[in-house]
């Protein structure tokens, strides 16, 4: 059973398509999906994305990290600083390590998964936060409906990383998927 969030969801989908006999179930949290339609941003979010591009071009990892916390932890339409304390510190620490790491390189196993989701026959669950980007919420709903044995669940009050904000709920959902796979 593979569990993946965001880009990890893309990797899990690719693995399920490339190696179906090795995958018994999927839990996808706000997954990126190769081949999915390009995001269309409403004006307010377009401004945030433009700002992110400017910050990334400047190259300051601390500024990039802080703004990514704003987008992915707080949620793009939520007040900045919505999530505080240990959760925010954990995000900044983990994401800071990733930002300072050497580039990982390109995936050699990338698959145009969006057009092939109906080939995935294992029990699958898609989770997303109600404070995540609108296009990610919509894509998550689409993925859940396109997977033959998929279910979809919005997590109220979470953004892009519900496993950080609501670990008990996410863990319970994973256990539900494990039970579906065992049954």
Question: How would you name each of these model-derived features?
Answer:
Residues 43, 57-111, 116:
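Conserved alpha/beta-hydrolase catalytic His-Asp/Glu region
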Residues 92-145, 154:
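Conserved serine/cysteine hydrolase catalytic core
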Residues 17-21, 142-145, 172, 176:
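Short, well-ordered alpha-helices that flank and scaffold nucleotide-derived cofactor binding pockets
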Residues 2-4, 29:
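Short beta-strand immediately N-terminal to the catalytic nucleophile in serine-hydrolase-like folds
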């Amino acid at each position: 059973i593979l569990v993946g969030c965001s880009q990890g969801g893309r990797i899990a989908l690719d693995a399920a398509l490339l190696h179906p006999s090795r995958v018994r179930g999927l839990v996808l949290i706000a997954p990126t999906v190769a081949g999915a339609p390009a995001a269309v941003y409403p004006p307010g979010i377009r401004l945030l994305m433009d700002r992110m591009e400017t910050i990334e071009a400047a190259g300051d990892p601390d500024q990039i990290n802080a703004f990514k916390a704003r987008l992915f932890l707080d949620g793009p339409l939520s007040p900045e600083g919505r999530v505080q304390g240990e959760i925010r510190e954990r995000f900044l620490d983990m994401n800071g390590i990733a930002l300072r790491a050497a580039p990982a390189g390109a995936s050699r196993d990338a698959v145009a998964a969006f057009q092939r989701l109906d080939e995935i026959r294992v029990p699958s669950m898609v989770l997303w936060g109600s404070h995540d980007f609108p296009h990610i919420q919509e894509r998550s709903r689409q993925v859940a409906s396109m997977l033959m044995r998929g279910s979809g669940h919005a997590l109220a009050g979470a953004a892009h990383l519900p496993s950080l904000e609501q670990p008990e709920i996410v863990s319970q959902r994973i256990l539900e998927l494990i039970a579906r796979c065992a049954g």
